């Protein structure tokens, strides 16, 4: 009986050590933002870290991480979150010419490091294969937009969190500015979280 208990305890200890070793290999969200890696490696690490993962336009991991972040900032408490946005090039959705030009540049992964200090938001965006952030911008507001898409869209519903400086702007205003040919119609914003679903 003692021998059986020893074997069971040994097996549990080995399993526990293996689990700890795996956790130590996965960087936390802060370390992950600074990690230079391929898009596929970054995607795998983001799924193992406390990060929000968006593939294409669909949330695939970290929904609870985002919810906890949004709850804190909604109360005015400082908080940070890392979003990993992964993109592939779909041959069926682009012209053959564009596909041939761009195919070697995909997949791509962008890290969005979002910090809230209690009064303003700062977002740093870095492609996983680059050392330095491509952009760093500050915004006053984080707005939440939900709704239904037109019948011709690929998804039925959307859920977006967008940084902007205008607390009264709507998603329709932002979209109109993006597609307008009018000088000055663009509304400064950064979509940090986008989830489209049926």
Question: Which residues make up each language-model segment?
Answer:
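Extracytoplasmic electrostatic interaction patches
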Residues: 90-198
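C-terminal motif of bacterial Sec signal peptides marking the signal peptidase cleavage site
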Residues: 16-19
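N-terminal export/targeting and maturation segments
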Residues: 22-112, 117
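Positively charged n-region of N-terminal signal peptides that target proteins for export
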Residues: 1-6
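Sec-dependent N-terminal signal peptides
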Residues: 8-10
């Amino acid at each position: 009986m003692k021998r059986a208990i020893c074997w069971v305890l040994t097996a549990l200890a080995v399993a526990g050590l293996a689990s700890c070793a795996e956790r130590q290999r996965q960087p936390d969200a802060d370390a992950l933002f600074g990690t230079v890696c391929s898009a596929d490696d970054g995607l795998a690490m983001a799924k193992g870290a406390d990060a929000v993962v968006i593939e294409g336009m669909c949330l695939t991991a970290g929904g609870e991480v985002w919810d906890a972040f949004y709850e804190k900032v909604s109360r005015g408490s400082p908080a940070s979150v890392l979003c990993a946005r992964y993109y592939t090039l779909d041959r069926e959705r682009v012209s053959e010419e564009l596909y041939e030009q761009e195919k070697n540049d995909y997949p791509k992964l962008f890290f969005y490091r979002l910090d809230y200090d209690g009064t303003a938001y700062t977002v740093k965006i870095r492609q996983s294969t680059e050392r330095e952030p491509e952009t760093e911008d500050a915004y006053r507001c984080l707005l939440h937009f939900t709704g239904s898409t037109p019948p011709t869209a690929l998804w039925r519903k959307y859920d977006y969190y967008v940084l902007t400086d205008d607390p009264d702007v709507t998603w329709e205003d932002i979209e109109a500015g993006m597609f307008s040919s009018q000088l000055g119609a663009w509304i400064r914003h950064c979509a940090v979280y986008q989830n489209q679903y049926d």
